[in-house]
Amino acid sequence: MRAAFGALLALSLSFTSANAADLLDQDFRRLAGDEVVNLGKAYSGKVVLVVNTASKCGNTPQYEGLEKLYQEYEDAGLVVLGFPSNDFMGQEPGTEAEIQEFCRLTYSVKFPMFEKVSVKKGNAHTFYDQLAA
């Protein structure tokens, strides 16, 4: 856990607050919902960890660690944002409703989850292209 937090801190230092504000000024729909959230407005002043997720891969158990990290540091200003993606060997094939149910029932995920997106270079959502730049 300490290593993950250290890596997060190191990554966060590579962005200035102006870069982060520009990057986060994007709208995403909540997973399996209609509510649209502007990340910049909703998470201004927070340390933001963005993760692409999949429910049927070897790393799926990381939901548990991500939720623990979120619960432990939420009051200190950390937010974990999950973005399901089916880009890697079809490991997130379900509907958004199925993904949401799986995350809640299997790992008690409470950190914010957003619409299913493409994260792979070439087809990536603009947000992920900007993260990779």
Give the ranges of each region predicted by the language model.
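Positively charged n-region of N-terminal signal peptides that target proteins for export
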Residues: 1-4
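Sec/Tat signal peptide C-region and signal peptidase I cleavage site
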Residues: 15-20
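Structural microenvironment flanking redox-active thiols in thiol-disulfide oxidoreductases
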Residues: 59-126
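Conserved hydrophobic packing residues within short motifs/helices of P-loop NTPase cores
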Residues: 48-51, 81
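Terminal helix/beta-alpha structural elements that buttress the NAD(P)+-binding lobe
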Residues: 25-27, 115, 129
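Bacterial N-terminal signal peptides
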Residues: 6-14
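A short beta-strand-turn-helix
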Residues: 26-47, 68-73
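Amphipathic alpha-helical repeat scaffolds
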Residues: 52-56
